[in-house]
Amino acid sequence: MRTIAAVAAVLLLAGCKASAPAETTQQLMKNKVDPASKVYFDAVQYISDETGEHDIKPQTDADWEKVRKAAADLQEYGKQLQGDDYAKGRNPDWVKFSQAMVDVSKEAEQAAKGKNVDKVFEVSGTIYSVCSACHMAYPLPVPPAASGTPAPSPSA
């Protein structure tokens, strides 16, 4: 009986061990957020070039489903970013930015569900604004130049 209790205790404690996030913030952005946002941003476009005017929009139910799923995925990533794995040690505005991503992504999903081309286009701009505001507050680290000397700061 003691052996069973000891094994159970070890297993229970092993389950309590803190684990690192599966991805860093930069990896989550690069591997998940960026691709999902690209699907949404690219769904509706109005292009005017030397070949004429081009209205890009989802054509099939499957196209619309991809756009809807991208918005739903962005909601989930926003929720992930609010968790301790990503928010711990950051200013409280990190959670506010992440929640703004969730909120606008809900609106984006509804626009896609409704197959509302104009609303998808409009919400794309709002998503971009939310992301840009966060990136202004939390800029990506500037990698060192190839020569080994630090690269100039973005404000220089």
Residue locations for each model-derived region?
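Sequence context surrounding c-type heme c attachment/ligation sites in exported
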Residues: 17-156
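Bacterial N-terminal signal peptides that target proteins for export
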Residues: 1-6
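C-terminal motif of bacterial Sec signal peptides marking the signal peptidase cleavage site
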Residues: 12-15
